[in-house]
């Protein structure tokens, strides 16, 4: 899964490196503005490329240069271990003088240090067998090449990598936008969770047994939960309805009318089922404890960590003491910025000497790098 993320000259991230080798789960902590959400934005660039978005202006804009420093390229690198092969993807974007839109300066995909394709500006070199040049062609320098290159088979490393990128889950849910209605199916959830209905429909449409996994989790966390229906309301239009039962009395509730926290329970259940049935997946969840009561946070975080322990990988952020306590020092990274004019720093919590209790140190603002 994710081994290394490197970002340079992108917003507050300069020469930034996150290493997650042999970690099934990890936590990012730090003050507001330290750069936690910016990491998710960098990951979202890779996710968008995997989902077929290749116009550079739809991925990165001129305002994304660190402190407006457009004379230095934005560089994004990701290393992923898939099927015991190490994939490394490099993308560098520049903004030449008098240009209004960024263009691709460099792009490269390697598998186990063997080049699949390389690119310098508009020139792309594609290799069929490692180190034997197969073809050269030109690509508009305002387009990322990865989505354009046709994979040759189901087992093609290009297909494997692009599918993994497309299936990256990045979440910062806004429950008020999560209605449970769906006009189609997808396996690609949106950051705000607004297409949970389509995601749920896509999951059950392809993997009917996923219903059991979702049902199991919801019963653990809501004792009066009975079942749920994805009702067909009209042509290609479905709506989620949740049913509860207590003392032989029944109640049906439209998904839209559930509380914010209950919607997040459903979202968590779908994440767990997705990782089991079409994973292993990489999930970045920005503050998963949001909208949850204190008594629910521990179980919620533990369920996520347990699900991803043997398959997949989850990276979370949090300011919540209960969530932070569920991660060890070795699985926790501290982010810090001295000011808005300086870049994000990162260190494992295990490498930092903390006087007394971690939570008290965070409350008092005593942790700095």
Each model region followed by its residue ranges:
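Conserved glycine(s) of the Walker
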Residues: 35
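Electropositive, glycine-dotted interaction segments
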Residues: 87-227
């Amino acid at each position: 899964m994710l081994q290394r993320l490197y970002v340079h000259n992108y917003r507050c991230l300069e020469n930034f490196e996150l290493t997650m080798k042999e970690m099934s789960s990890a936590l990012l902590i730090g003050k507001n503005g330290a750069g936690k959400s910016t990491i998710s934005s960098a990951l979202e660039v890779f996710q968008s490329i995997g989902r077929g978005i290749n116009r550079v202006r739809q991925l990165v804009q001129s305002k994304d240069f660190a402190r407006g420093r457009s004379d230095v390229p934005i560089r994004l690198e990701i290393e992923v271990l898939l099927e015991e092969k190490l994939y490394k993807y490099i993308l560098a974007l520049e903004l030449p003088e008098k240009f209004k839109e960024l263009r691709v300066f460099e792009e490269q995909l390697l598998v186990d240090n063997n080049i699949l394709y390389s690119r310098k500006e508009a020139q792309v070199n594609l290799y069929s067998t490692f180190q034997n040049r197969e073809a050269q062609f030109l690509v508009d320098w305002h387009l990322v090449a990865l989505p354009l290159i046709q994979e040759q088979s189901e087992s093609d490393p290009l297909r494997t990598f692009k599918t993994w990128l497309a299936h990256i889950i990045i979440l910062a849910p806004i429950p008020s936008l999560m209605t449970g209605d769906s006009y189609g199916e997808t396996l690609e959830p949106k950051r705000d969770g607004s297409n949970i209905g389509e995601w749920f429909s896509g999951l059950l449409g392809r993997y009917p047994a996923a219903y059991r996994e979702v049902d199991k989790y919801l019963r653990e966390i809501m004792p009066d939960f009975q079942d749920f229906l994805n009702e067909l309301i009209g042509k290609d239009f479905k709506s989620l309805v949740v049913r509860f039962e207590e003392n032989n009395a029944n109640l049906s509730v439209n998904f839209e009318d559930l509380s914010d926290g209950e919607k997040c329970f459903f979202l968590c259940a779908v994440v767990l089922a997705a990782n089991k049935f079409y994973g292993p997946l990489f999930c970045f969840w920005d503050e998963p404890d949001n909208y949850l009561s204190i008594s629910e946070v521990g179980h919620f975080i533990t369920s996520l960590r347990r699900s991803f322990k043997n398959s997949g990988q989850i990276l979370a952020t949090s300011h919540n003491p209960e969530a932070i306590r569920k991660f060890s020092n070795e699985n926790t990274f501290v982010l810090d910025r001295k000011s808005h004019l300086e870049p994000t720093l990162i260190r494992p919590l295990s490498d930092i000497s903390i006087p007394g209790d971690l939570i008290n140190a965070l409350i008092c603002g005593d942790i700095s790098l």
